[in-house]
Amino acid sequence: YVGSFLIWQQPHFIYLAELVYRANPSDEVIKKYNRLVQETAEFMYAFATYDEFHGRFILKGAIPAQETLRAATTINPPFELSYWHFAMQTAQKWRERAGEKRNLEWDEMIDKLSPLAYNEDHLYLASEDAVDTYKDIRFTSDHMAVLGSVGILPMNKLIRDDYMKNTLHWVWDNWNWGKTWGWDYPMTAMNATRLGEPEKAVGALLMDKRTNTYLQNGHNYQDGRLRCYLPGNGGLLTAVALMCAGWDGCQVKNPGFPQDGTWDVRWEGLKPMP
């Protein structure tokens, strides 16, 4: 029953609508999608719980993208926190584009959303309750979703750049890479790109692991049971686009590739990511 408890797909509509608007910033796009953007944000606001004792909003009762965690005990998974922050801010932008006032309750949640939890080594946890993240292999297998908090998504105030770099380095050296999926490699590449580590970005895409295999027909092979895995293909295309075109505010040309003259990168028609 994993799928029933996943919440990380909920903001997808807002993210995709934002990409459509950025490709065609018009009233037509706003009229077509704004109602669904707002209704998605209404659910996201209602799903979050206000922790009165600590004066913060938390996410709980869900299985995170790293599916080895349990819904009954998981509090504040990092990727979901970051995605909530991004999507709620984006929904507010859509209100303004549509000539509507910002929702003050949503602004309060954006302001009081819990920061990502970390341990004494300044490594981000798989979730706030997973204090043994770096001791229990259950937490260091499957998707390293903590890296998606910055990479798939832009940096935000819930995250410290230095702690996220610490986390990337630990994952790179110690993760149970034999228990990963095809989109984990582009997710790692996007994280490394945003953190200014292009060598690791390229290295992640070229990592010699079974689930990072692409067959001659282009399919991302996982195993004999799962010979085509489209999330890997989508992740690869997204990662390369970010590595080439960058993101809002990025000043580095081709930020996902080493800047030492060894790469001649050519591309066209790509747009920066949020």
Predicted regions and their residues:
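Acidic/histidine-rich catalytic neighborhood
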Residues: 39-97
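Active-site core of glycosidic bond-cleaving carbohydrate-active enzymes
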Residues: 1-23, 31, 78-248
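Surface beta-strand/loop "capping" patches
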Residues: 254-274
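A non-catalytic, amphipathic alpha-helix used as a structural packing/dimerization or gating element
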Residues: 32-39
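Bacterial peptidoglycan biogenesis and beta-lactam-recognition machinery
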Residues: 245-257
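A general structural signal for short secondary-structure junctions and capping/turn motifs
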Residues: 4, 49-50, 138-141, 270-273
